[in-house]
Amino acid sequence: LLDKWKTEKTHRSWGWWSVIESYGKTCKIKELVVNPKSSLSWQRHEFRSEVWFVRKGTATIYYSYDKEGVKNVFKTTKVEKQTQRISRYQWHCLANETNKELSIIEIQFGDDCRESDIIRKQLPRGDYLFSD
């Protein structure tokens, strides 16, 4: 498993991600590294759920159970060795609001763990750090 950790990185404006292991189309394990003062977009998934394990750093997670993702936005903070579950269809955003790198192990599971199932939305509030 650790040999696969050295796979190719996909770079984004917020940092990078790499697939550690893939088990068909229904389960995938990735590492996400989020740069300081950066975040992923406000998004949800059609076909999968996720569990995030904080490997290094402090994660700030915004989420909403609202179908449209614009009401009742909650915020939680997770530190090393803590986890957060993101349910299928749940609006969410992973942010690194610190000055140190954030590393997350993401376990995706569901009917289809493909990147194209991401649905992004305009920000529900203007004070988030979101990027693509």
Language-model features and meaning:
Residues 65-92:
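Short acidic-glycine-tyrosine-enriched beta hairpin
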Residues 29-33, 51, 75, 83-85, ...:
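Conserved hydrophobic/aromatic beta-strand scaffold that supports enzyme active sites
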